Design a protein with these regions (language model features):
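Short, flexible, solvent-exposed loop/turn segments with mixed acidic/basic and small polar residues
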Residues: 67-70, 141-143
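Donor/substrate-binding cores of folate-linked one-carbon enzymes
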Residues: 1-68, 75
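Charged/polar, solvent-exposed surface patches and flexible loops
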Residues: 34, 46, 70, 90, ...
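An anion-binding loop in the catalytic cleft
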Residues: 76, 81-180
Length: 180
């Protein structure tokens, strides 16, 4: 989190103070937003008195280290299962709670809220990415470009968000079904 001086550019002002906020493997877009808001508020309260008494020396930003983040859109959430299991799991976490990651199941949008990279997934028989390779009582396993992703929490179009074990009470996807 950075507290900076405003100038005419977009996020180009001098840096006043910064604080590193760790991102865990369980963080979602929503939980990270909350963490950053909390850290930013605390940092601002620490910075204002120092700014007022002149004990802060502004630091010019190094433009070579800057990056641009494009706006989030719903289309960004469409899962391409040909990617790596790790990248897809991170996409799902990053887009939780908006715009959310999704695929298609039986012609309907299926939002995926929680997943994890399946253990020993490289031992699974390779299928076309997006193919359901296994269904258990509480999980659906989907082939990705380099392994298998275990779906844990989903939401079918027009329904509420639920654990996969609850989804499976009303739906019986079969191994071999292709999502997308």
């Amino acid at each position: 989190v950075t507290i900076m001086q405003m100038n005419e550019g977009l996020d180009t002002g001098d840096i006043l103070t910064q604080k590193i906020v760790p991102i865990t493997a369980e963080d979602t877009g929503e939980s990270l937003f909350d963490k950053l808001c909390e850290a930013g508020g605390q940092l601002l309260l620490e910075t204002l008195p120092k700014l007022e008494n002149g004990s802060i020396t502004p630091v010019k930003q190094d433009e070579s280290k800057s990056s641009y983040a494009k706006m989030l859109t719903k289309e960004l959430g469409h899962i391409d299962f040909s990617g790596s299991a790790v990248e897809i799991e991170r996409l799902i976490r990053g887009l939780n709670s908006w715009p959310s990651a999704y695929t298609k199941y039986e012609g309907k949008t299926l939002k995926i809220w929680k997943s994890r990279v399946a253990e020993n997934s490289e031992k699974e028989q390779q299928q076309k990415p997006g193919t359901i390779v296994r269904v258990t009582d509480d999980s659906i396993y989907v082939q990705t470009g380099d392994g298998v992703l275990e779906l844990l929490e989903v939401q079918l179009e027009g329904k509420k968000r639920m654990q996969v074990k609850d989804f499976l009470l009303g739906h019986r996807p079969q191994a071999g079904t292709v999502l997308g």
